[in-house]
């Protein structure tokens, strides 16, 4: 069985079809604008911005778009949007808990779109706090194995604040407190270990095992939510079979 982290990592490696690439670009640009607004336009002194830029470049977002997003976010160019972060909570098929992260300039529009998408795909909204307690905010770094053992990775990050290293199959997941994420990332780089992504994420404390049919319904719901313009990320506490994961 595989959890959300392995599913998200597998999905990240798949090519994004043209119909969805525009939405992906928009989400990546939003992240850059917000990071520049909060921490300033210099990625050397703003690790959140540096990570947002790296993710955008990994998805082939043009450099000009990236630079303009930085300037807008930092107030150096007109046209910046005052994005508001919101987290919605809900349940999917099989009782799976969902945290839905949004960045929006219209709270009412975001709430309506998320609620409609949940209802149409077998989900339901939940009251604030009724789902969030099932997740912990963690720093998550995904490291491709590339011939390395779990002990190799653990040795590189243990003194940097890493809490654990999990085997995801083709990669390792390094977990830390959010405040230690930059130190963990830098420790990997110093050891010559490449990482695929470094994010602050919601990690479930308990996973719900799903049969294959329910798992497919949950993944369809998450995909529909991720297609919403205001939704940046969706987190869920499920275990699904490797057979269903292979269909992603």
From Swiss-Prot:
GO terms for cellular component: cytosol. Keywords: Cytoplasm, DNA-binding, Transcription, Transcription regulation. GO terms for biological process: regulation of DNA-templated transcription. The keyword Translocase does not apply. It holds the Pfam family Transcrip_reg. The keyword Transcription regulation applies. It is found in: Cytoplasm. GO terms for molecular function: DNA binding. PANTHER family: TRANSCRIPTIONAL REGULATORY PROTEIN YEBC-RELATED, TRANSLATIONAL ACTIVATOR OF CYTOCHROME C OXIDASE 1. Belongs to the TACO1 family. NCBIfam families: PRK00110.1, PRK12378.1, YebC/PmpR family DNA-binding transcriptional regulator. This is Probable transcriptional regulatory protein Acel_1346. It comes from Acidothermus cellulolyticus (strain ATCC 43068 / DSM 8971 / 11B).
């Amino acid at each position: 069985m595989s959890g959300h982290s392995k599913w998200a990592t597998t999905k990240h490696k798949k090519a994004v079809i043209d119909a969805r690439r525009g939405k992906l670009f928009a989400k990546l640009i939003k992240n850059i604008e917000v990071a520049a607004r909060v921490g300033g336009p210099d990625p050397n002194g703003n690790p959140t911005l540096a990570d947002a830029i790296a993710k955008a470049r990994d998805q082939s977002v043009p450099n000009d778009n990236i630079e303009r997003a930085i300037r807008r976010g930092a107030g150096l160019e007109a046209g910046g949007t005052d994005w508001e972060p919101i987290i919605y909570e809900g349940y999917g098929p099989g009782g799976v808990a969902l945290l839905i992260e949004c960045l929006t300039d219209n709270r009412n529009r975001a709430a309506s779109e998320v609620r409609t998408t949940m209802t149409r795909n077998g989900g339901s909204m939940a009251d604030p706090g009724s789902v969030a307690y099932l997740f912990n905010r963690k720093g998550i770094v995904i490291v491709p194995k590339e011939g390395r053992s779990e002990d190799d990775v653990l040795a590189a990050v243990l003194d940097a604040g890493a809490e654990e290293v999990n085997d995801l199959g083709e990669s390792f997941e390094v977990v830390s407190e959010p405040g230690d994420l930059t130190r963990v990332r830098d420790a990997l780089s110093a050891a010559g270990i490449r990482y695929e992504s470094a994010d602050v994420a919601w990690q479930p404390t308990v996973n719900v095992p799903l049969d294959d049919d329910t798992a497919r319904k949950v993944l369809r719901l998450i995909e529909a939510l991720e297609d919403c313009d205001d939704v940046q990320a969706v987190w869920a506490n499920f275990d699904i079979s490797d057979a269903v994961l292979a269909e992603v």
